[in-house]
């Protein structure tokens, strides 16, 4: 959530950025208008309170009942006016909160303006890892089904389209990737959390999925939701708390993730790229303002390191304003190479949120006797299903009907290859 005081101090700056973030600008204009009105009412209310206090102090100096009654009437009249101003201000507060809740975050100065993904900027490529940018026509879902690693048909029978069953060596490979990613991140100082996969709605508000993106979520009864990402329960671990942030809080978490994929239409109907339920290892940091950008850069390095260890060619992409998510100030996507599609596909979005989520989730810290909202960072490290797909395609030996396992993953998987049976 944005800071109303900062908006009112510089409305033109915020308006321009939010236009480029594809915000509903009519909400912003209304916010500025009623925000100013709210400020005037609050200022007038405080002024009247001060006047009441001043008059009350003079009460003991009065000698006659007539003077006292006259002052009482005057104070009563002012108090009534003050209460009216305060009540009007409180009524405006509800609307201000609604408007702030539905406006996206601003962006950092180095984020380029742009409408959509076509304006994103590739800032680095690592093309020579493993077998490099090979191309072929063997899709991961065909290879995986041929080797008996997955079962899409029976998953559909159980749960409908966009679900998968990992089985045999496929289940083992998914588990190996999970353990490898968790262990590697833990070695870098992240603390592991295994949270609930069901959360209360206010937690989704805290991280910015609600109220704007409810259609993308799986809603249960009693205001409960399946998590779309570990970002939600892990960031909200400190919801409505004041914590010590002399050092960043660093967490890593494996979870199943659940998304309705509303609006995805016919995109990626087959395979592991876009599912209703998928596996992901997430890294989350909660920091003070001074450490925010530095820790964001470290988080990008940590997620990238996993792709390098797995020998997967990838590129780093700086998202433009129009493609940056609702809550994010800056996002770097890590995109891995898929030979059958002859293109890069996202496997991680590492985002810096400033105090946007901290303000919504009321996560605070003290510094020099003042209280501030925490800054947050998160990103996948990594999306297991998409890494699974890339590993199969990149390491498939069609001549010998083998899938080779990257060297760093062998201790977790227990073998250097998967043979077709």
From Swiss-Prot:
Keywords: Aminoacyl-tRNA synthetase, ATP-binding, Cytoplasm, Ligase, Nucleotide-binding, Protein biosynthesis. Its EC number is 6.1.1.11. The keyword ATP-binding applies. PROSITE patterns: AA_TRNA_LIGASE_II. Pathway: Aminoacyl-tRNA biosynthesis; selenocysteinyl-tRNA(Sec) biosynthesis; L-seryl-tRNA(Sec) from L-serine and tRNA(Sec): step 1/1. ATP binds at residues 259-261, 346-349. It is found in: Cytoplasm. It catalyses: tRNA(Ser) + L-serine + ATP = L-seryl-tRNA(Ser) + AMP + diphosphate + H(+); tRNA(Sec) + L-serine + ATP = L-seryl-tRNA(Sec) + AMP + diphosphate + H(+). It comes from the Bacteria. L-serine binds at residues 229-231, 282, 380. GO terms for cellular component: cytoplasm. Catalyzes the attachment of serine to tRNA(Ser). Is also able to aminoacylate tRNA(Sec) with serine, to form the misacylated tRNA L-seryl-tRNA(Sec), which will be further converted into selenocysteinyl-tRNA(Sec). Belongs to the class-II aminoacyl-tRNA synthetase family. Type-1 seryl-tRNA synthetase subfamily. Homodimer. The tRNA molecule binds across the dimer. HAMAP family: Ser_tRNA_synth_type1 (MF_00176). This is Serine--tRNA ligase. The lineage of its organism: Bacteria, Bacillati, Mycoplasmatota, Mycoplasmoidales, Metamycoplasmataceae.
